[in-house]
Amino acid sequence: EVCIPAADKIPLILRETREWLDIYFSGKRPDFTPALAPEGSEFRKMVWEELLKIPYGCIITYGQIAKQVADRKGILRMSAQAVGGAVGHNPIGIIIPCHRVVGTGGNLTGFGGGIRTKEALLKLEGMDMGRFYIPKKGTAL
């Protein structure tokens, strides 16, 4: 027998997250973000904060995020590869939208859920996939 708790017994963060995901997967833009608190290094958290700024249905490159992080840290430059590493350690995919990050020139690369999943999420958000290079092999298809 499966015991399902009453809605008022489910923690608020789980109710908010479920509501957010229901809205998102219905093809709509949620107008709130659950109050999640992922754990990670200061650098990773900074990158994840930048990911949360990417609007629904939009993309950004690893290099652009690197520039934003460098600006915040008050340094001249930041490695796009270092940003890619932080993006790859995102513990809350979809809500922290790492699928909206693409390589230079629109290459769909580096998504833990696989490139086909990244493609599906971007399509759900209304992106025209004809503008992207989608690899046939490799890079976590």
Name the predicted role of every residue range:
Residues 1-17:
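General nucleic-acid-binding
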